[in-house]
Amino acid sequence: MGRVGVLLLNLGGPEKLEDVRPFLFNLFADPEIIRLPFPWLQKPLAWLISTLRAKKSQANYAEIGGGSPLLQITEAQASALTTRLERLGQDAKVYIGMRYWHPFTEEAVEKIKGDRLQRLVILPLYPHFSISTSGSSFRVLEEMWHNDPSLRQLDYSLIPSWYDHPGYLQAMADLIAQELKKFPNPDQAHIFFSAHGVPQSYVDEAGDPYQAEIEACTRLIMRTLDRPNQYTLAYQSRVGPVEWLKPYTEEALQKLGAEGIDDLLVVPISFVSEHIETLQEIDIEYREIAEEAGIDNFQRVPALNTHPVFIDALAQMVMDSLNDPPCTFETVPHPKKNMKMYPQERWEWGLTTAAEVWNGRLAMLGFIALLVELISGQGPLHFVGLL
């Protein structure tokens, strides 16, 4: 079979507060996040947005210890996966490629090229496929493969999604069952699945399978759990004025509180690692919303991280991928060329569609004013000492 590698893909996150601003710059410099009519404006606008948003985002990260634990957890997952593959008789080197922070996907690919692999399995750490997560990373890799003849010699295969893998479902069910034991009446606790949202247009216009996979996954987890608990699925992290997948997590929590639900177990279904959306958004923001709605006992299932059943599932996916016909970049969904994309981070873009348009116009005017001040050396930012 030759030398085998596994490339784990994820979003990435700032490891310390000083990383937040450049992380945001990378996020908004991605043309899949903000599409402009003039490409040369992409990076200047990303600089402006990241500068304006850095302080608020830093405050959120400060609430969870000053940075994202995502890389540390992903490294632990990679190490555990390497060990599990060895036990299965498969010698493989595991690489980590993050979309918007170190180690970048490009860095991982350079290491892969240097190691002269014969086989590569590309495994996103997103159970459910979306054009904005796995799809975004796949598009970066596809462009690299297109531009580099040496990469085209590498025998590779993608694992687009794995929301229905029995090992993953069992690991999720095990975690839920453990947390249910903490409630006075475990079978009466309401199970609340919170998935990361995407704009409704991704599903309606681009054919993104994300919503269908999330809904199917929720049903499969409940079937695997085999408990009588009632459950709800909602979508978190909505940004901007456009409609996202519904119901929204905050509204669903308020509705359950009004219905008299006291015991609630939140399951972060989109996330296999602890990061800002679990530690800050769910544990702090949504907990506060739930308590204000009258939900007295708010608990959360931990992310999978290095749960042994989960790691076993990842290893089995890799082994199956090595033995099955390859899945290539051409086989996964691609967004339309003119489709507007939104980041997988939470930023306020405006209250209405008209407000979003005006926000963009004002941002452009602000950017032009900034250029004038930088060239002239005079202006309000110089006066207050910011430049």
From Swiss-Prot:
GO cellular component: cytoplasm
Ligand binding (Fe cation): 196, 277
GO biological process, one term: heme biosynthetic process
EC number: 4.98.1.1
Induction cue: Constitutively transcribed under all tested conditions, probably a monocistronic operon.
Free-text disruption phenotype from the record: Increased light tolerance in a strain missing photosystem I (PSI); may decrease chlorophyll synthesis. This mutant has an insertion between the ferrochelatase and Hli domain which is expected to allow ferrochelatase to be functional. In a quintuple hliA-hliB-hliC-hliD-hemH deletion chlorophyll half-life decreases 2-fold while the half-life of PSII proteins does not change; photosystem II assembly intermediate RC47(1) (PSII monomer without CP43) is missing. De novo chlorophyll synthesis is very slow.
Pathway participation: Porphyrin-containing compound metabolism; protoheme biosynthesis; protoheme from protoporphyrin-IX: step 1/1
The name this protein goes by in its record: Ferrochelatase
Organism of provenance: Synechocystis sp. (strain ATCC 27184 / PCC 6803 / Kazusa)
